[in-house]
């Protein structure tokens, strides 16, 4: 198998587990503090508001449109291409004093005045605050249910100490990612929820690969402390981890740089989540299982007595 690193010597990952724990606790505490003070910059999918799609005769200049809307008092508008360079989507937060139709006409007028181009309204939609609340609850419930299912799955496949480490690693990834979004006030919409669920699956996959090697080595390596066996297991899977994470990050970075405003938040969430998830599969999931006292006997298969074995032992 192709390898980036051919480690002839086992890397002592667990030697740095205390430093990693301190770092993780600091990042989680900082994220929770940021979330509690600034919270999240919810998008229209969650807060409600107005969505207006307009068409141009030639490729639209988004910066010119933003400047035109800002001059007319619509500085909170989100402007991005939709479908093609001639189609533009404008998102606005709820405005109680203006109806949806009136707001649409004001937007069209502001764009025409600011750009001097012919503009056609394609569609206008209004997302009520009740729908936004339902989406918020559904998104949070989706993440919670996924964590519970993962806890049950890993408990059945491996052992409860490893399951606790896996779930804590996933919670660690989500909290830190949301903390960065809160600190930077990046808009959170449904694509961000999809990205978080993707991060959960990606991080879990990486963790399961490491755990599978840990279980295999616990059964094969008769000598050595649990920390030594974990170091050997992580070292053996390190090349696979770097190849998988690296190739995925190349694609995500391309999306981040060239994907446009519509998927910028999605790419940012994946970029943060994959980076933090690679770290947590080593220094949160595995290290926490070690702190909880994982031993060889916990992962050894149960011995099954053969029928009639007691008669075979008789002289």
Swiss-Prot record:
Subcellular location per the Swiss-Prot or TrEMBL entry: Cell membrane
Topology of the protein relative to the lipid bilayer: Multi-pass membrane protein
Main location: membrane
Gene Ontology terms: biological process: intracellular protein transmembrane transport; protein targeting; protein transport by the Sec complex
Highest taxon above the source species: Bacteria
GO molecular function, one term: protein-transporting ATPase activity
Segments traversing the membrane: 19-39, 135-155, 164-184, 191-211, 249-269, 270-290
GO CC term, one of those recorded: plasma membrane
Keyword annotations from UniProtKB, A to Z: Cell membrane, Membrane, Protein transport, Translocation, Transmembrane, Transmembrane helix, Transport
Functional summary from the UniProt entry: Expression of V.alginolyticus SecDF in an E.coli secDF mutant restores protein export in a Na(+)-dependent manner, strongly suggesting SecDF functions via cation-coupled protein translocation. Part of the Sec protein translocase complex. Interacts with the SecYEG preprotein conducting channel. SecDF uses the proton motive force (PMF) to complete protein translocation after the ATP-dependent function of SecA.
Subunit and partners: Forms a complex with SecD. Part of the essential Sec protein translocation apparatus which comprises SecA, SecYEG and auxiliary proteins SecDF-YajC and YidC.
Family, similarity comment: Belongs to the SecD/SecF family. SecF subfamily.
UniProt-recorded name of the protein: Protein translocase subunit SecF
Native organism: Vibrio alginolyticus
Gene assigned in the entry: secF
């Amino acid at each position: 198998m192709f390898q980036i690193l051919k480690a002839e010597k086992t890397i002592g990952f667990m030697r740095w587990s205390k430093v990693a724990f301190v770092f993780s606790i600091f990042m989680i505490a900082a994220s929770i503090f940021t979330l509690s003070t600034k919270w999240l910059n919810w998008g229209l999918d969650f807060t409600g508001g107005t969505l207006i799609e307009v068409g141009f005769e030639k490729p639209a200049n988004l910066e010119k449109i933003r400047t035109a809307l800002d001059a007319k008092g619509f500085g909170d508008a989100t402007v991005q291409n939709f479908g093609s360079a001639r189609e533009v989507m404008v998102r606005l937060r709820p405005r109680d004093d203006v109806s949806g139709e009136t707001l649409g006409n004001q937007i069209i007028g502001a764009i025409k005045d600011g750009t001097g181009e012919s503009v056609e309204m394609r569609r206008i939609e209004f997302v009520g605050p009740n729908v936004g609340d339902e989406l918020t609850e559904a998104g949070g419930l989706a993440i919670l249910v996924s964590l519970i299912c993962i806890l049950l799955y890993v408990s059945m496949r491996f052992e409860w100490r490893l399951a606790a480490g896996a779930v804590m690693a996933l919670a660690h990834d989500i909290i830190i990612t949301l903390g960065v979004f809160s600190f930077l006030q990046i808009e959170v919409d449904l694509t961000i929820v999809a990205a978080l669920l993707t991060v959960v699956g990606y991080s879990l996959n990486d963790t399961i690969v490491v755990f599978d090697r840990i279980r295999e080595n616990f059964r094969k390596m008769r000598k050595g402390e649990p920390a030594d066996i974990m170091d050997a297991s992580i070292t053996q899977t390190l090349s696979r981890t770097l190849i998988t994470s690296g190739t995925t990050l190349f694609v995500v970075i391309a999306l981040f740089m060239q994907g446009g405003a519509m998927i910028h938040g999605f790419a940012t969430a994946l970029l943060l989540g994959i980076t933090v998830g690679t770290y947590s599969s080593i220094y949160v999931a595995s290290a926490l299982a070690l702190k909880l006292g994982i031993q060889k006997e916990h992962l050894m298969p149960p011995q099954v007595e053969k029928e009639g074995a007691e008669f075979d032992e008789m002289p």
